[in-house]
Amino acid sequence: MLLETRHLSKVYDNKQAVNDLNLQIETGSFTAILGPNGAGKSTTIQMLTGLLQPTAGEILYDNPIKLGVVFQNSVLDDMLTVQENLEIRAGQYKDIDKGKVDSLVNQLGLQNFSTQLYGTLSGGQKRRVDIARALLNSPDILFLDEPTTGLDIQTRKAIWELIHQLQIKEKMTVILTTHYLDEADDADMIYIVDHGQVIAKGSANRIKEQYAQNFLKVFVTDTADLKEILKEEIPFEEVRVNELLIHPETTEK
């Protein structure tokens, strides 16, 4: 086991951000932590990478290992070129091969904009550079905290294809957070979290088979008119006051 957490918890000002989290990460695996905004995903990443101290629980690594992290917000300098940013970061590590920056520039397709200022790049280009920066020290685990946030669908797909290929070719251990199930499709293990707790886990296929449902939850101030419209057309149930769960039989309507 490369990484394991036991009963990991984090409390901020009496608010439980992460609650009794148990993860098991195998060497060379692709693990996705999936959940909505505020579920505790970023807090978990920050604890796993040593940026936050847990309130309780343990984080166990198999021997000292090197970590690479792609944060939601970039840590690179907008006023430096891509090449300059990467060379400065490379200089902060010991024993990095002199050709490492050039190798990553080629591997991640940064050649066409390596001399541009980082601040002038598109969102997708910045993400590629951010990933290159995280790979400078040849990490044993690459952490990606919602790396496609704010990107359009085509750019999202390109970034995830890049990450997937890196994971396969380099046999890299990858841990990512996302709120898109499709981005976790290639994961060996998915942990679905909500309010800081794991509520489901398994492969993408198992998660979809066991938990995916075709329904729409609707919140309204008064359900009377909506129920009148729906009763002849679409099955529904009233789960709480002013809250309906609609079960469409098809997505074509």
Predicted regions and their residues:
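Helix-to-loop junction immediately C-terminal to a conserved catalytic motif
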Residues: 49
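Conserved ABC ATPase "signature" region
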Residues: 87, 98-113
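Conserved ABC ATPase signature
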Residues: 117-121
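Conserved catalytic motifs of ABC-family nucleotide-binding domains
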Residues: 138
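Catalytic Walker B motif of ABC-type/P-loop ATPase nucleotide-binding domains
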Residues: 142-145
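ABC transporter nucleotide-binding domain
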Residues: 162-245
